[in-house]
Curated annotation (Swiss-Prot):
Disulphide-bonded residues: none
Naturally occurring in which organism (per UniProt): Herminiimonas arsenicoxydans
GO biological process per UniProt: iron-sulfur cluster assembly
Cofactor binding comment, as recorded: Binds 1 iron-sulfur cluster per subunit.
The name this protein goes by in its record: Putative iron-sulfur cluster insertion protein ErpA
Keyword Iron: yes
Length: 116
């Protein structure tokens, strides 16, 4: 019997996150900007998320487009973000980008760092 391996789902980039990024890009006045999401060592749990604007798409970047907004993720970060959802929340706790990551085995209290 042949078993079909289930492929990890790609990264989900919510409509609200794309809308907020589009608003920020418009505020910057540079339509060439793209949102780069990355994982780096640090934080109280070992890894932390980072967000920055970038005009350059690197050779090893995975790119996604949502509602005209381009998201960039480098190959090292991608392995930690497969299956994650990048969202933007504006509620009683404040306005912030949030990453729901199924690969994170533990997270810190603030949610900005994790262990994979």
């Amino acid at each position: 019997m042949n078993a079909i391996a289930e492929m990890p789902s790609p990264i989900l980039f919510s409509d609200s996150a794309a809308a907020k990024v589009a608003e920020l890009i418009e505020d910057e006045g540079n339509p060439d900007l793209k949102l780069r999401v990355f994982v780096q060592g640090g934080g109280c749990s070992g890894f932390q998320y980072g967000f920055t604007f970038d005009e350059i798409v690197n050779e090893d970047d995975t790119t996604m487009t949502k509602n005209g907004v381009q998201l960039l993720i480098d190959s090292m970060s991608y392995q930690y973000l497969v299956g994650a959802e990048i969202d933007y929340k504006d509620d009683l706790e404040g306005a912030q980008f949030v990453i729901k990551n199924p690969n994170a085995t533990t997270t810190c209290g603030c949610g900005s760092s994790f262990t994979a």
